[in-house]
């Protein structure tokens, strides 16, 4: 048994050193190319409207606010200033979303974003995004990369298509530090020793982002309060949780397997599903020794089996916001197909680790 485990770990490490590192290098090259174009567009936006200041800065070889959705799809979060005069309200009525409400009606004129405040005192995510979309469309026509970049049509999101190969979504957002959403108040679970109190304090201090983007849990609902709502995002908190042991290596292998074998019709699976399942696996295996290099095969196998279970149940709860289903709106046939494909993949890896050379 131990020999079989060791063999699997050996082949997973080989896979990581060859396939995953090649994927990372290719994505890093793409990011540099894409960020040159996005920075140029945002510089042009800032000239037209100084309230939208580019926050796309490179630090330690990574860009703050940039998320890799897939090797050809990215999201850049554009942090806005001055959320000050608004209260953050998440009463759970909009899963995965919250609203920003004027703390005092008399402060309306003090807000940097006064024309985007609704009659009822909410800062409208939709109105800000609409204004930003107009500015980006103008900037695309003026910027020095105008021959290789165009706006993606038929969406209220701000999306750029670059060199007909890559899609980048630029999302206006507020960074919320030092507060924690009520809808995530159950976290961490009291009976689970992971993460330790110090890491919990770090994660909560890191806070979360409020994004101006279409909220999939509200698809089909048209009430104005809902279209004015902001989407909660915990990217930095999640990254912090997945430090240490073989967690990041495990996630990297899962992302590479997804890119190569689970990019399926209906797009049932993305990298965020993988990231979410790694967090759940950390809860199931709370000891640091469970994430030793020698356990890499066990952890990967556990996550793939959990993924199959989620696909068969057609439900994948968000790690911090369990009322939010990450499979919402995905076609059932696509989820079933993904379950079958994941099962084939898991069986292949477990019964014949050497097959990773071809996967």
UniProtKB/Swiss-Prot annotation:
Q: Which terms does the record give in the GO molecular function aspect?
A: ATP binding; GTP binding; metal ion binding; nucleotidyltransferase activity
Domain commentary: While it shares structure similarities with CGAS, it also features a number of differences. The crystal structure is in inactive conformation and the enzyme would require a conformational change to be active. The nucleotidyltransferase activity is therefore unclear.
The record describes its quaternary structure and partners as: Monomer. Homodecamer; composed of 2 back to back homopentamers. The protein may exist as monomer in solution and oiligomerizes upon ligand binding.
So which disease is it linked with? Cerebellar, ocular, craniofacial, and genital syndrome: An autosomal recessive syndrome characterized by moderate to severe developmental delay, intellectual disability, cerebellar hypoplasia with ataxia, variable microcephaly, ophthalmological anomalies, facial dysmorphism, absent or underdeveloped nipples, underdeveloped labioscrotal folds and scrotal agenesis.
Q: Which GO terms describe its biological process?
A: anatomical structure morphogenesis; camera-type eye development; cell population proliferation; eye development; positive regulation of cell population proliferation
Which EC number(s) does UniProt give? 2.7.7.-
Gene designation per UniProt: MAB21L1
* Gene3D superfamilies on file: 1.10.1410.40, 3.30.460.90
Q: What does this protein do?
A: Putative nucleotidyltransferase required for several aspects of embryonic development including normal development of the eye. It is unclear whether it displays nucleotidyltransferase activity in vivo. Binds single-stranded RNA (ssRNA).
Name of this protein: Putative nucleotidyltransferase MAB21L1
